[in-house]
Amino acid sequence: MTNNLKQRRIILDLAVTLDGFIEGKNGEVDWCIMDPDMGFTDFLNQIDTILYGRKSFDLWGQYIPKNEDPDTEKELWKLVHSKKKYVFSRTQNEIDNQAIFINDNILEEVNKLKKNPGKDIWLYGGASLITTFINLGLVDEFRLSIHPVVLGEGKPLFIDVKQRINLKMVNTRTFSSGVVQIVYHWNG
């Protein structure tokens, strides 16, 4: 009998500006285009777990759309909140009904997660957590949606990466909004 269970992958799926920023200088993400053709719902159906840094979790991990927001946005957030959430934090350590907090032993804890049965895992961010995962060799797939805007300043995607990373491009897609999505695999 063959074993059809494959190890779960850590996928960094992120919007980024042409000049490499994931947020503007004041944390703004108003430049991010939610293009329905990008298949974000399909991506969310491919995962069952989301990994957040504490700041990202505080901002987005518990986000509730406003009553006046479109139904499509409400459905999207409902799908996001249906996923199991892990928060990486040096300061918070409680487990609540919204998330499981991980304070140390990141490499070991994430490798345990990857070996558990389930769908792929979304590395949501923020930038510091992304850097930690890259430096530990934990990112399996980079799925970057490059938006047609140059901010000039803001929070860069890659900070303090300590090694050269050779990637293999596996897919590119372009959208009428001007967004270009590039998918790379890394066998770090």
Curated annotation (Swiss-Prot):
Gene Ontology annotations of biological process type: riboflavin biosynthetic process
Topological category with respect to the lipid bilayer: Single-pass membrane protein
Keyword Transmembrane helix: yes
Location within or outside the cell: Membrane
Listed Pfam families: RibD_C (PF01872)
Domain of life, source organism: Bacteria
Keywords: Membrane, Transmembrane, Transmembrane helix
Transmembrane domains' residue ranges: 121-139
Protein name (database record): Uncharacterized protein YyaP
Organism (species): Bacillus subtilis (strain 168)
Gene behind the chain: yyaP
